[in-house]
Amino acid sequence: MLEKLDPQKASLAIFVVATATLVGAWIFQLAGYDPCHLCLQQRGAYYFAIPFSLLLSVSAGKNPKGARRGLYILALVMLGSAIFGAYHAGVEWKWWEGPDTCSGDISGGLPDLTKIVVACNEAALRIVGISLAGWNAIISAVLAVVALAGARHQGSSSVSQ
C-alpha cells in the first residue's frame, strides 16, 4: 500500500491526518483537558506540517522533485515529533524526569500563584491505555513513514533519484 503513495497523495494524507490530530487536541482542550507545557510544544510539528504538506500536495504535480525533498523534511520533522511524544509519555509513566517547567513551584513569587501549571508527569487522559502524548508519538511515527514512502516513490509522476 505504501508503495502507491506518490508525493501528492502522501502530502495530502499528511495534511488530513495532521489537521485532524491538531483539531482533536483543541477539542480535548475545550472539553477541559488542559495541555501541559510539553503538550503545547508537541503541537509545533503539526503547526509546521499542516501548511507545508498542503503546499507540497498542491505543488507536487508541477515539481515532483521538490515535493519529494519536502517530504524528506516532513519525515524528519514528524520523526522528531514522535521522539518528543515518546519522551513525554515516558515522563508520564515516571520512566524519567520531565523539565522544571512542567511542575508548579512558588519560587517565582505571588504573580505565579494565579497561573495554572498543568503537570507534565500526569496523563490528563488515556485512550485504550495510551496517553495523548503516546498517541502523538504513534501518529507522528506513522506520518513520518508516510512522508518517507511518498519521498521514495518511483512512479511516472516522480523524478528518478
Regions found by a protein language model. Give the residues of each.
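Interfacial segments of alpha-helical transmembrane regions
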Residues: 5-16, 62-82, 145, 149
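C-terminal TM-helix exit segments that contain a strictly Trp-centered aromatic cap at the helix terminus
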Residues: 20-29, 79-95
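Membrane-interface helix-loop junction between the first two transmembrane segments
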Residues: 27-37, 160
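Loop-to-helix transition at the N-terminal end of transmembrane alpha-helices
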Residues: 34-48
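Hydrophobic alpha-helical segments of small multi-pass membrane proteins
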Residues: 53, 71-85, 101-109, 140, ...
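Structural signal for the C-terminal ends of transmembrane alpha-helices
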Residues: 54-63, 148-155
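Extracytosolic (periplasmic/ER-lumenal) interhelical loops and adjacent juxtamembrane/interface segments
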Residues: 93-133
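A hydrophobic membrane-anchoring alpha-helix module
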Residues: 117-161
